[in-house]
Amino acid sequence: MADLASHWNAVFAAKDDPQLGWYEADVSQTLKLLDLVPGLAGATVFLPGAGTSLLVDVLLARGARLVLDDISDEALRRLRARLGDREPQPSWLHHDIARPLPPGIPACDAWIDRAVLHFLLTDEEITGYFRNLRALLRPGGHVLLAEFAVSGASRCAGLDVHRYSVAEMAERLGPGFGLVHAEDYTFVNPAGAPRPYVYALFRRQS
């Protein structure tokens, strides 16, 4: 974890939020799919790679109970400072989401990942990620994955990425998950470059 944590700490330390390549001032694309999820108010929502995302503010305003995970303690420090005493207070987790989770993490009703999974490259890392997802997500819960599409960039933030199709997402999740909705989306990053994403919302059936 140390090398990747150092990399991401350096990325966050070097730039203000609006300069980060994945920064979104408008999180409406994610909300478009989350609007298909009933009962987010009061739900427990896990965000791997929460970073400094403005989605956190929106979900808190909607009454969600958040578990915010990131490999970068610098990102979590900045996010804590921004949120201040806002209620409900999130739970905080400084952890590599590809590694086994520590005990005591609450089960969640939704798992929301924008641009995290695609940084995991080895089969061990990807398998570990989905093992954690399945361990935390309740039956009936929802998973939103938003990753670089097959036609997307091959690198981001100085790292190689694994690009995804909806079919591969479904295969990795396994037979207990059903697709609710998926769509392609081109995000224009702060530098003005187009970044093709695939957004997919799944529901856990068992």
Regions found by a protein language model. Give the residues of each.
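A conserved beta-strand element that flanks and buttresses the S-adenosyl-L-methionine
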Residues: 112
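Short catalytic micro-motifs in class I SAM-dependent methyltransferases
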Residues: 115-119
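Class I (Rossmann-like) S-adenosyl-L-methionine-dependent methyltransferase catalytic domain
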Residues: 1-106, 123-206
